[in-house]
């Protein structure tokens, strides 16, 4: 996956394009190559280095059977992220982060259990409900599914959270920091590298940039998953 062509591929996927110099975080200076036409250009050599680091970490997590939650409120990548999570058997949240998702885990778990009840036992009782009760039931199920469908199989707080769009996810970051949940982030030039454990300096606004990174992450997650499957078979 990592070869001589990767920087060229990153360039065409627009990973190098940062924000205008009027909108940046000085803490990202180390990862900037230059300024061009008023925009900061991300150093792709460093992007390769940190992407390798993240991919190796993710592969290790997969081998150990650890679970990752992917979080992004970027509407343009919702379908891709859902598909990605299904393929890698991960969890996802694509709506605005609900305060207390982690810090009030008992309430979150209650909502997940209720959604799963509607999906299984609720269907059995559906025919016995009145028209009004069915309407109320559908509304409640729809509301729960909006926020919890991507984590309905999550039995506990995940081992790692992968954030896409750090500037939109302050609540999620705050809860991860409070509970010492490790995070991985794609960091654009307006982001803060001190607010995450692992990161990839890259354009986090471009769909092509995000998809490029997710494809690498998927490859290493599945690679790690195959190793754990073999280990389970031979043990």
UniProtKB/Swiss-Prot annotation:
Gene3D superfamilies, per database record: Glucose-6-phosphate isomerase like protein, domain 1 (3.40.50.10490), Helix hairpin bin (1.10.287.610)
Coiled coil feature spans: none
Listed GO biological process terms: translation
GO MF annotation list: structural constituent of ribosome
Pfam families reported in the protein's UniProt record: Ribosomal_S2
Keyword Oxidoreductase attributed: no
Xref: CDD domains: RPS2
Key words, A-Z: Plastid, Ribonucleoprotein, Ribosomal protein
GO cellular component, one term: plastid
Primary residence: plastid
Subcellular location: Plastid
Keyword Magnesium included in the entry's annotation: no
Domain of life: Eukaryota
Family to which the UniProt record says this protein belongs: Belongs to the universal ribosomal protein uS2 family.
Protein name (record): Small ribosomal subunit protein uS2c
């Amino acid at each position: 996956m990592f070869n001589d062509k990767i920087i060229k591929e990153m360039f065409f996927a627009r990973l190098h394009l940062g924000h205008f110099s009027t909108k940046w975080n000085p803490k990202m200076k180390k990862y900037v190559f230059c300024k061009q036409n008023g925009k900061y250009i991300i150093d792709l050599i460093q992007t390769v280095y940190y992407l390798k680091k993240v991919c190796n970490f993710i592969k290790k997590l997969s081998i150990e059977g650890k679970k990752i939650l992917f979080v992004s409120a970027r509407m343009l990548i919702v379908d891709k992220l859902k598909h990605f999570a299904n393929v890698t058997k991960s969890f996802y949240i694509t709506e605005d982060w609900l305060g207390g998702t982690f810090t009030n885990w008992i309430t979150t778990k209650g909502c997940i259990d209720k959604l799963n009840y509607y999906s299984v036992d609720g269907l059995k009782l559906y025919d016995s409900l009145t028209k009004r009760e069915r309407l109320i039931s559908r509304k409640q199920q729809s509301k729960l599914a909006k926020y919890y469908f991507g984590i309905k199989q999550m039995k506990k707080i995940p081992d790692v959270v992968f954030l896409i769009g750090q500037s939109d996810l302050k609540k999620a970051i705050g809860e991860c920091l409070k509970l010492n949940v490790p995070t991985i982030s794609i960091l654009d030039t307006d982001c803060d590298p001190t607010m995450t454990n692992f990161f990839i300096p890259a354009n986090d606004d471009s769909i092509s940039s995000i998809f490029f990174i997710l494809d690498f992450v998927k490859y290493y997650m599945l690679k790690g998953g195959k190793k754990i499957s073999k280990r389970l078979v031979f043990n």
